[in-house]
Amino acid sequence: MNEFLPFSRPAMGPEELAAVSEVLQSGWITTGPKNQALEQAFCALTGNQHSIAVSSATAGMHVALMALGIQAGDEVITPSLTWVSTLNMIVLLGAEPVMIDVDHDTLMVTPQAIEAAITPRTKAIIPVHYAGAPVDIDAIRAVADRHGIPVIEDAAHAAGTYYKGSHVGNRGTAIFSFHAIKNMTCAEGGLIVTDDEQLANRMRSLKFHGLGVDAFDRQTLGRAPQAEVISPGYKYNLADINAAIALVQLKKLEKNNARRTEIAERYLTELANTPFLPLSQPAWAHKHAWHLFIVRVDEATCGISRNGLMDDLKAKGIGTGLHFRAAHTQKYYRERYPALVLPNTEWNSDRICSIPLFPTMTDDDVTRVIAALRDVAGY
């Protein structure tokens, strides 16, 4: 019997082990020089002036919203088809998430849908770069600029994603994730990029108790030995153990994403005559990072439901994922917004299925997934 093939697996090697060993032997295992190196290296990738490493992308979203002053009575525009942490952070700050529909085939928000949702209470817009493809950020920024509303790009899926020749996040404020299934990972972690120095300073303080400096700053940069609280903050700093892993993963990102692209191209070609519908590619110039490969499973054309397909593949020893169940259909948000209807989001949320895609997949692994899907479809 074949070994179980998960939908995702982190691509780790001896370089990551050596990086962790170096930190463990250094005597400085929490936030320190590896964090600084990671922040500098990521700025070099995206072209931003500032970056702040954090313990998760969720933590990054929290401090970004706080740094913008989001509070009770404010509205924040976001798709419902996103990971629930974004909605949760908005609600926990006392603000209202304004959930909008997505394009039927790219699953990304459109500037038109954003424009229609703006009110005098709108204080932020959070578009999602979905599955490794970029949203039309120029058009979205144009809408936001006309109304004087800040944009926070959810780039959790977008390490290595390029839009019109520039890395996602360039010239803006964006949040990346280093969670275990992401294109680059350090188990748990995240990073915010921005060109707004005042915003960067505020987020850096908020992620570490609201202090002006962290322990490494005090020890190595000759600053005041006692830190001072500027405003109440959180404990969202990233340990150097994690940052060291992320640095190695960043060096491997281009190569790993190239392998992801090879796998995705095989899926696109060899599943083209099956009823499993892939997402459409954006019309604007871009470089896809292929964080996810998603098929839509419509029972009317596939002869099986999405959940049925997931069960069938599991029985064949193949893992799958769901990215995402629409937030407004989940208990808390359904009860809070019972009248909200988002047709494209709901249609896709019932049908999307993420199939295995990770850089250490072998060609035989890819063949196995394709064969299983073709078998289910009767091809």
From Swiss-Prot:
Q: Which InterPro entries match?
A: ArnB_NH2Trfase (IPR022850), DegT/StrS_aminotransferase (IPR000653), PyrdxlP-dep_Trfase (IPR015424), PyrdxlP-dep_Trfase_major (IPR015421), PyrdxlP-dep_Trfase_small (IPR015422)
| Annotated GO biological process | lipid A biosynthetic process; lipopolysaccharide biosynthetic process; response to antibiotic
Keyword Transferase among record annotations? yes
Q: Which residues cross the membrane?
A: none
Instruction: Indicate yes or no for the key word Lipid biosynthesis.
Output: yes
* Gene Ontology cellular-component terms listed: membrane
Superkingdom of the source species = Bacteria
Record EC number: 2.6.1.87
* Keywords, alphabetical: Aminotransferase, Antibiotic resistance, Lipid A biosynthesis, Lipid biosynthesis, Lipid metabolism, Lipopolysaccharide biosynthesis, Pyridoxal phosphate, Transferase
Residues with N6-(pyridoxal phosphate)lysine modification: 182
Q: Which reaction does it catalyse?
A: UDP-4-amino-4-deoxy-beta-L-arabinose + 2-oxoglutarate = UDP-beta-L-threo-pentopyranos-4-ulose + L-glutamate
**CC cofactor:** pyridoxal 5'-phosphate
An MF annotation (GO) of this entry: UDP-4-amino-4-deoxy-L-arabinose aminotransferase
Catalytic EC class: transferase
The pathway it acts in is: Nucleotide-sugar biosynthesis; UDP-4-deoxy-4-formamido-beta-L-arabinose biosynthesis; UDP-4-deoxy-4-formamido-beta-L-arabinose from UDP-alpha-D-glucuronate: step 2/3; Bacterial outer membrane biogenesis; lipopolysaccharide biosynthesis
**Briefly, what is this protein's role?**
Catalyzes the conversion of UDP-4-keto-arabinose (UDP-Ara4O) to UDP-4-amino-4-deoxy-L-arabinose (UDP-L-Ara4N). The modified arabinose is attached to lipid A and is required for resistance to polymyxin and cationic antimicrobial peptides.
Q: How does it assemble?
A: Homodimer.
| Family statement drawn from the similarity comment of this UniProt entry | Belongs to the DegT/DnrJ/EryC1 family. ArnB subfamily.
What's the protein here called?
Answer: UDP-4-amino-4-deoxy-L-arabinose--oxoglutarate aminotransferase
